[in-house]
Structures are given as C-alpha cells and as structure tokens.
Amino acid sequence: MKNSTNQGFDQHYNAQVAVDQDSLLIVGQSLSNHPNDQAEAQPTLEAIPPALGTPSSAALDNGYFSAANIEHFKALRIDPYIATGRDPHHPSWHERFAQSLTPPPEQASPKVKMAYKLQTEIGKAIYRLRKCTVEPVIGIIKETLAFRQFSLRGLSHVAGEWALVCLSFNLKRLHTLTNGQLPPLRISPTGC
C-alpha cells in the first residue's frame, strides 16, 4: 500500500477473529492482505474447527455486508445479523418510540431485509452482543497484550504471528476462566 508521507510502500494486513460468546475464547482466526472485511467472513468461519460445531447465528459489523455473505451463511444454516450501515448514536424520540416496522416484501433487496431483521427485538439483542463479545477481545489484544503491529513480513509469516497472538490471548483468557487453577499436566513415563 502506498504511503503518502514518505513515498514508500507499507505492508498492511487484515486480521480476523471468531469469538465464543460465553467464554470469550477465540475459536477461529484468519489473516489476509485484503483492504476491507467483505471477503473475510468466509475464511474466518472456515477457520473454526469442526469439533467445535457450527454457530447458530453470527453478528458482524457493516464492513462484512454483502449479499454473497448472507447467502453463504444461510447455506451453512447460520442465521446472519450483519449491520447495513452506521446507526445514529442518539435517535430522535420519534424513532425511539415508533411503532413496530412492517416486514419488507419478499422481492426486497438483501440490504432492506437485513435492516428490518436488525430492528426486530431478537435482531437488536443478538447484534448488541457483538459489542461485548468481539470488541473486548480486540481491545485486550491491543491494550493489555500491547499488540499493535506485526514484527514479521510476508503473508505466511504474519499469519503465523497472528496465530501466536490469538494463542497467547486464549492462554490468558483460560487462566482467567480457571482462576489460575489449571489441572496438572500428566505425562506418561513412556512419552505417549
């Protein structure tokens, strides 16, 4: 990516995480050099190990919104809740106390249908959880673990570095969840 300040080029990467809502553990991670998040939902979802199962729903911010992503989630039987734009911080009292919206017609665009879905009570509740699931994890990685930039270069090396960052977050989180009382590691005398 062209850097306008020094006329050189910078390497930028797009790191993603899938976070379990109950434990706040990172269950899947991916990294790419794509400039936006629209193409990142599918690789991040595929990074979740099959042994953990498939989530029943997913809440994503508006950077992930596309008709293709909605169809991909539906094909996997995952109920998507993807923002369609920015919500105002302070809606007017008319909007706050407005009567319930009427469902959009069947031929409405995916964006109109998703906007309606997010205005339902269940849509609001599920999307609200995103703010206290994924965002704290990213904040802890940036602030507590002090990880703000990659030390390595090249996509494969940086992907490995991101995997280590996610692993270190999960170890820290497991320590918190178990109050530092992890079961002892048992090593058999034969080494197997």
What annotation goes with each model-predicted range?
Residues 1-192:
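Anion-binding and metal-coordination hotspots
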